[in-house]
Curated annotation (Swiss-Prot):
<dbReference type="Pfam" id="PF02899">
    <property type="entry name" value="Phage_int_SAM_1"/>
</dbReference>
<dbReference type="InterPro" id="IPR050090">
    <property type="entry name" value="Tyrosine_recombinase_XerCD"/>
</dbReference>
<keyword id="KW-0238">DNA-binding</keyword>
<comment type="function">
    <text>Site-specific tyrosine recombinase, which acts by catalyzing the cutting and rejoining of the recombining DNA molecules. Binds cooperatively to specific DNA consensus sequences that are separated from XerD binding sites by a short central region, forming the heterotetrameric XerC-XerD complex that recombines DNA substrates. The complex is essential to convert dimers of the bacterial chromosome into monomers to permit their segregation at cell division. It also contributes to the segregational stability of plasmids. In the complex XerC specifically exchanges the top DNA strands.</text>
</comment>
<dbReference type="GO" id="GO:0003677">
    <property type="term" value="F:DNA binding"/>
</dbReference>
<feature type="domain" description="Core-binding (CB)">
    <location>
        <begin position="6"/>
        <end position="92"/>
    </location>
</feature>
<dbReference type="GO" id="GO:0005737">
    <property type="term" value="C:cytoplasm"/>
</dbReference>
<comment type="subunit">
    <text>Forms a cyclic heterotetrameric complex composed of two molecules of XerC and two molecules of XerD, in which XerC interacts with XerD via its C-terminal region, XerD interacts with XerC via its C-terminal region and so on.</text>
</comment>
<feature type="active site">
    <location>
        <position position="176"/>
    </location>
</feature>
<keyword id="KW-0131">Cell cycle</keyword>
<comment type="similarity">
    <text>Belongs to the 'phage' integrase family. XerC subfamily.</text>
</comment>
<dbReference type="GO" id="GO:0071139">
    <property type="term" value="P:resolution of DNA recombination intermediates"/>
</dbReference>
<dbReference type="Pfam" id="PF00589">
    <property type="entry name" value="Phage_integrase"/>
</dbReference>
<keyword id="KW-0963">Cytoplasm</keyword>
<dbReference type="GO" id="GO:0009037">
    <property type="term" value="F:tyrosine-based site-specific recombinase activity"/>
</dbReference>
<feature type="active site">
    <location>
        <position position="247"/>
    </location>
</feature>
<dbReference type="GO" id="GO:0006313">
    <property type="term" value="P:DNA transposition"/>
</dbReference>
Length: 303
C-alpha cells in the first residue's frame, strides 16, 4: 500500500461497511462502489491527492477528465461520479468535509441509445417458420407471444400455465421489481400458444412453466436467445434476432399505429413514461424517412 492509498483507503473502507451494514445494500452493489472508488483512489494518487479533506471541485473535475481519457464512456463516467458523490456526501455527514465538492460537477452527456427493431415484413418472415417438430411449434409460440405482447425475456420464461387465460387472451407476467401486470396476447399469439399447449405434455412437464426445454424443465433465458438467433438465420432475416429486439419492434409498431404513448407504457410495464419516450425518437425517425422519400421538396443536397 502506498503512502497515498494508506491515507485514502480507510475512509473508503468505512463507507463500504456503512453501505453493507447500515444501508444493507446488496454485496453486488457494494462491490460496484468498491470498484469505482478504488479506481478513483488510483487516479487520485497519480494526481498527488493525499487526503479526502483536501479534495476540491477542480480536483473532482480532474478525476472525471482522467477517467474519460482512460477510455470510460459517458454512462460509465456518470456511474463513477455518482459513486464519488455518495461517498463525499457520507464524508460530509461524518464531519470530514464541510461540503460536497462534487455537487456541481457534471459528466459529458451520453448519446441516447435508440433500440433497434425490425420492420413488419421482417417480423412476418421470421414467424413463417417450418413447423416440422414440437420444438418448432414451441419456438413459434414463444416468438408470437414475445412480439404479440412485447414481453421482457425474463417475463416470457417466467410464464406459468396458471397465469394464462386463453378465453380472454390475457396473461399475468412478473416484471421488474416483482411487479405483476396483465397484458393482452393478441389472437395470433393465443392460437399458437394453444398449438404448443396441446403438445406440451409430450415433454413430461416437471413444473407449471408454459415453455419447456426438451428435458421437461422450464426453458432457460439463454436457450431462448439461442433459438431465436438460429431462427433468424434460418429465415434469412437481415438482422440478428434476439428477444429484446422483438420487444422493441412491438413497441415501435404499436406507437407507429396508435400514437398512444401511455398505452405503450402500460403494455411494456415501464414505471416511468420517460423510459417509453425513447420510442418517440424511433417513431420520428420513421416519419422522417417517409418524409424524405415522399415529399417533393425533401431531396437532400439539391437546390
Amino acid at each position: 500500500m502506498t503512502e497515498f492509498s494508506a491515507s485514502l483507503a480507510p475512509q473508503v473502507e468505512a463507507f463500504l461497511r456503512y453501505l453493507s451494514i447500515e444501508r444493507q445494500l446488496s454485496p453486488l452493489t457494494v462491490t460496484s462502489y468498491r470498484r469505482q472508488l478504488s479506481a478513483l483512489m488510483e487516479i487520485g494518487e497519480q494526481m498527488g491527492l493525499a487526503h479526502w479533506q483536501t479534495l476540491d471541485a477542480a480536483q473532482v473535475r480532474s478525476l472525471v477528465s482522467r477517467s474519460k481519457r482512460a477510455g470510460l464512456h459517458a454512462s460509465s463516467l456518470a456511474l463513477r461520479l455518482s459513486a464519488l458523490r455518495s461517498f463525499l456526501n457520507w464524508l460530509v455527514s461524518q464531519g470530514v468535509l464541510p461540503a460536497n465538492p462534487a455537487k456541481g460537477v457534471s459528466t459529458p452527456r451520453s448519446g441516447r441509445h435508440l433500440p433497434k427493431n425490425i420492420d413488419v415484413d421482417e417480423v412476418n418472415k421470421l414467424l413463417s417458420i417450418d413447423l416440422n417438430d414440437p420444438l418448432a411449434v414451441r419456438d413459434r409460440a414463444m416468438l408470437e407471444v414475445m412480439y404479440g405482447a412485447g414481453l421482457r425475456l425474463s417475463e416470457l420464461v417466467g410464464m406459468n400455465c396458471k397465469h394464462v387465460d386463453l378465453a380472454s387472451g390475457d396473461v399475468w407476467v412478473m416484471g421488474k421489481g416483482s411487479k405483476e401486470r396483465k397484458v393482452p396476447l393478441g389472437k395470433t399469439a393465443v392460437t399458437w400458444l394453444q398449438h404448443w399447449l396441446a403438445l406440451r405434455e409430450l415433454f413430461e412437464p416437471q413444473d407449471d412453466a408454459i415453455f419447456l426445454a426438451n428435458t421437461g424443465k422450464r426453458i432457460s433465458a439463454r436457450n431462448v436467445q439461442k433459438r431465436f438467433a438460429e431462427w433468424g438465420v434460418k429465415q434469412g432475416v437481415s438482422s440478428h434476432i434476439h428477444p429484446h429486439k422483438l420487444r422493441h419492434s412491438f413497441a415501435t409498431h404499436m406507437l407507429e399505429s396508435s400514437g398512444d404513448l401511455r398505452a405503450v407504457q402500460e403494455l411494456l410495464g415501464h414505471a416511468n413514461l420517460t423510459t417509453t419516450q425513447i420510442y418517440t425518437h424511433l417513431d420520428f425517425q420513421h416519419l422522417a424517412t417517409v418524409y424524405d422519400a415522399a415529399h417533393p421538396r425533401a431531396k437532400r443536397g439539391k437546390s
